[in-house]
Amino acid sequence: MRTPIYIKGGMRCFFAFLLATTTTGMSLTSCVADNDANEKSISDYSDTDVKSYGDLFQVFWSVMNQRYCTLNEQSAVSSQTWDQVYKEYKPKFDALKTFQHTSAFTQQEIQEDNAKAKQYFQEIIDKIIDQHFYVKITLPVSHSSMETVRFNSTLRNKTEYFPLNAHWNHTRDQLNLDGTAFGEITSDGFCIMGGYLKEQPGTYYLGFNKFALYENCFHEYQKSYLPGNAASTYHLDASKITDKAKELITDAGKREKAEQQAAQLLADMDNYLASDDAAKACEKMTAYSNQGDYSGLYALASQAYEVAPGLLKLLPITADASGMGEQIRQKLQGDTRYQQMLSASSFANWYCQALADYLWHERELYAYWNDLKFTYNHLCVEGYRRLFLEPLAKGEIKKLILDFRGNGGGSVIDTRLLTDYLITQTAVYAYVRKKEDNNPYSYTPWIPQKITVTSKSLGRNIPTAILLDNYSASMSEVTTLILKSQGDHVKTIGRNSYGAQAMLTSDNEASNGGWIGNVTSYLYFYMPFSLTKDAQGNLLESVGITTDYLLDEMTGEEKEKLYQNDASAVDRGLKKAMEILK
């Protein structure tokens, strides 16, 4: 079993902010409007439309012209309108002749055109305001090869990056490690830490590197586990094994050994499912769902997982038992305890599938094993709720520090798993504008985004400090705007945030703007469908949230000391938050 607060590992961040109308009260245009610009519909483009670099640029420009939501604001950062971009760059792309990269051109000519095309696209995209936006473009490199290049805006230089996993040990040492703290870095890079500060009793620190709370810190457990029913069609016991062995194995000696091995494997499974370890884990998992005492959930689930038969740990986790018999047979191949049984192929085939059917259909093993393994791999399922949300609800957390530094965003549903407890009044936290139709400068009015009080609200304002850096993006920024809408008890500290609050959807028919997906095999767009302003009307895209307490950028030496947990290291952001909340 792992030691919760001491886990250290890698991280992966930057998930996009996805729209959830149930949370924000936003409305979406129900369908894409007719193309008033009389251009070809985006979905109608195909590879036959791209025969040259000029064609490639034409398709790129047309998609942006129809779907990009921020052309009107581009004038603030560029001396060119979008039409002027076309007039300057269309002739440049037309002058590149080697898109077909045939033997009519030398390799050097192909690669020179490749370099120019990349330069031109980067010059255009450098001025893009939207910080979620990127485009992948496939270009010829030689007579027989292509490359796909990702182009992002470099409009704003982002330097302040302070991810939680890098300063994990230093921050952990600021917390009371008396059983009230929790922390974890999961195998897929989710990183979270929470606990009371040693120097400031009642002040709680919570930091995480991406908004993936729902998938890591919550789980819907069953109301009960591991039923048994001897009358089930799928019931398996020693007598059935004996009967089938007599039917399928003629050699008495081989039959006896095969029967013994099969019966022993079944007994091992039954003994485990009836064990105290499994029972205690089941009790805590059901208690989590039934609002009972689930303390010790992680420890007991880990114990039950670790003592489980090795075969269970080798099998794929799936609800479908079809073909599971073959999976069992394959996993047993290397185990000397079952070779006599496996050598009787007809019996082995029957037995392995019968065992799978019994475990999956009568004992409902999938539900138990899936939930047990999830808990084993996510100690924060217990920690986030028992050591953060419950003390918060009880009023034990008097002040709160939220560390969003290095947090690139994630799922919008996570807002409800944090902010719902801290919202005490309905408030407008932002304004959103979308495309009204496919004309480049046709927009909806600015639509107010409201956060409302839910039944989870604590009904009291908790002094809160939010730590930000240049890589606090997307949902980190939206969550900050939501909490800031609640009043002056919420303060922000650090550097300007990333500046990426626009909304994304994978449904390209849901709105008149934005596009996620390919347009021909040469172009892949990742384009938001909206633009966001804060409650005061400030455009934050590419600018970011300016903190209430703007700190000087951390030096390389400062960061290195914090990363190495040097005795002289000082986290100025955390220190400032503690001063403000004192």
Regions found by a protein language model. Give the residues of each.
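Sec-dependent N-terminal signal peptides of Gram-positive bacterial secreted proteins and lipoproteins
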Residues: F15-T23
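Flexible, low-complexity junctional segments that flank or bridge functional domains
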Residues: V32-I401, G406-G408, I413-R416, T424, ...
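Conserved acidic, small-residue-rich alpha-beta core segments centered on
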Residues: E306, L312-L315, K394, K399-I401, ...
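C-terminal motif of bacterial Sec signal peptides marking the signal peptidase cleavage site
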Residues: M26-S30
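Bacterial N-terminal signal peptides that target proteins for export
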Residues: R2-F15
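Extracytoplasmic/peripheral linker and loop segments enriched in polar/acidic and small residues
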Residues: D94-A104, L300, E306-V307, D548-K582
